[in-house]
Amino acid sequence: MKLLVLGTGGTIASAKTEMGYKAALSADDILQLAGIRREDGAKIETRDILNLDSTLIQPEDWVTIGRAVFEAFDEYDGIVITHGTDTLAYTSSALSFMIRNPPIPVVLTGSMLPITEPNSDAPRNLRTALTFARKGFPGIYVAFMDKIMLGTRVSKVHSLGLNAFQSINYPDIAYVKGDEVLVRHKPRIGNGEPLFDPELDPNVVHIRLTPGLSPEVLRAVARATDGIVLEGYGAGGIPYRGRNLLEVVSETAREKPVVMTTQALYGGVDLTRYEVGRRALEAGVIPAGDMTKEATLTKLMWALGHTRDLEEIRKIMERNIAGEITGS
């Protein structure tokens, strides 16, 4: 049994500086500080590919991480990626679309407290990730606070608390208790050949609808992007009274994809439920269903990386690719 830990930085790798915490430690440092032996149930090797606060992560970095993961499949039985928590859910979603049919467990983890701090959650999360990488099943997952969650269903829900991640609109995959993996929900596992498909178009914007949002602001943003994710209210809909955003959306949706998600954490979008939602559908808006905001954004980037045909993009967004959407 041979595992690889890929270091990318984040709080888990941070040390104090005059400007606050900054990513500074290697993956090897993290293992040593966590008290994890290289032969602790498996031979563990480390490799550092980035060392960044995850606020600084860009789509190009997802490709770098994805390539490192894909190229390691033949040599390792499981992979753990240490990552900052702020954009971890974006990275786990992006990797899930770029890497098809992973043959081994790929587990992202991080911590809310640096591993150099007393009572850090880093050792606990790292051990959880390594245990699942050793005993779990193929796919891309997030390990946090003893939970294993599907990579496309995770959102960060707390900015400071240790239990910072939840699986949204989808059950937890498993729990890790000591050296034991307690499976709760086994996802669909592809049996095709592994494929690395990293084509992304990062020129996508996410806009949260708020009362008073100017149509001219929305129009200006729409002109500068290749696709838009609109975060609407509740089950979804677009204002058309007073400041008429629906008119702008209708114009935009004739030329580029406009996808609607919701500001509500749970439940997803149903544009058939209310009149404001049906008007959005008639305007050409693509519903995100019960996808997370992170999965919606990264999936749209991935779709645009493959085609500009609006009907094809709609089909991609509505199709379940990596467990990100229910009922497709």
UniProtKB/Swiss-Prot annotation:
InterPro entries assigned to the protein according to its UniProt record, in alphabetical order: AsnA_fam, Asp/glu_Ase-like_sf, Asparaginase/glutaminase-like, Asparaginase/glutaminase_AS1, Asparaginase/glutaminase_AS2, Asparaginase_C, L-asparaginase_C, L-asparaginase_I
Activity at various pH: Is active at a wide pH range. Optimum pH is 9.5. Optimum pH is 8.0.
EC number: 3.5.1.1
Keywords carried by this UniProt record: Hydrolase
Biotech exploitation of the protein: L-asparaginases are widely used in fried and baked food industries to prevent formation of acrylamide, a neurotoxin formed by the reaction of asparagine with reducing sugars. TK1656 is highly active over a wide range of temperatures and pH, reflecting its potential in the food processing industry. In addition, its high thermal stability may facilitate its handling, storage and transportation.
Catalyzed reactions per annotation: L-asparagine + H2O = L-aspartate + NH4(+)
Protein's job: Catalyzes the hydrolysis of L-asparagine into L-aspartate and ammonia. Also displays D-asparaginase activity, which is about 50% of the L-asparaginase activity. Does not exhibit glutaminase activity.
Protein name: L-asparaginase
